Swiss-Prot record:
Pfam families: MoaE. InterPro entries: MoaE_sf (IPR036563), MOCS2B_euk (IPR028888), Mopterin_biosynth_MoaE (IPR003448). CDD domains: MoaE. Its EC number is 2.8.1.12. One of its GO terms (biological process) is Mo-molybdopterin cofactor biosynthetic process. Keywords: Cytoplasm, Molybdenum cofactor biosynthesis, Transferase. Catalytic subunit of the molybdopterin synthase complex, a complex that catalyzes the conversion of precursor Z into molybdopterin. Acts by mediating the incorporation of 2 sulfur atoms from thiocarboxylated MOCS2A into precursor Z to generate a dithiolene group. The gene is Mocs2. It is an enzyme of class 2 (transferase). It comes from Culex quinquefasciatus. Heterotetramer; composed of 2 small (MOCS2A) and 2 large (MOCS2B) subunits. GO terms for molecular function: molybdopterin synthase activity. This is Molybdopterin synthase catalytic subunit. It is found in: Cytoplasm.
Length: 157
């Protein structure tokens, strides 16, 4: 079995670092997802995001995602999930997921599933900071998150 590289950090995320961590000589693929701060939302100019987490639970949830990934795609080798906390300016990465596998199909499918699951289950919250005169800032509820009102309104529990 491969390794899981999980990290919550206030430092800038390094895509090269996580790629190097998950690369393996038996693998023909490393699939990466890099989530970045975009400069707009709902017609408002976003200048940065502010992330907070319940860190112990977030790491536990990230580890559970890795266990689920390995159950669904048995040939995955290494998995890396790094999430930034604190201030994340526009264009910078807030989350990086990297997965190595002997074949690209499994790695690509697993990365897509992992980001969707991360958004659903990991207790990380973001606040959007808007340009001056556009409402200052707003905490955002992730509609995919299983404890959110939007999720509960659209799913039978």
């Amino acid at each position: 079995m491969g390794s899981n590289y999980l990290k919550l950090t206030f430092d800038k995320l390094d895509v090269g670092e996580i790629n190097e961590l998950v690369a393996h000589e038996s693998c023909g693929a490393v699939a990466l997802f890099v989530g970045t701060t975009r400069d707009n939302f709902d017609g408002k100019e976003v200048v940065l995001l502010q992330y907070e987490a319940y860190e112990a639970m977030a790491l536990k949830s990230m580890n559970h995602i890795c266990e689920e990934l390995r159950g669904r795609w048995t040939d995955l080798v290494h998995i890396g999930i790094h999430h930034r906390l604190g201030t994340v300016p526009v264009k910078e990465a807030s989350v990086v997921i990297a997965i190595s596998s002997p074949h690209r199909e499994a790695a690509l499918e697993a990365v897509r599933w992992a980001i969707d699951e991360l958004k659903k289950s990991v207790p990380v919250w973001k606040k959007e900071q808007y340009a001056e005169g556009q409402g200052c800032s707003e905490w955002k509820e992730n509609k995919e998150c299983t404890w959110s009102k939007a999720y509960k309104d659209n799913h039978i529990l």
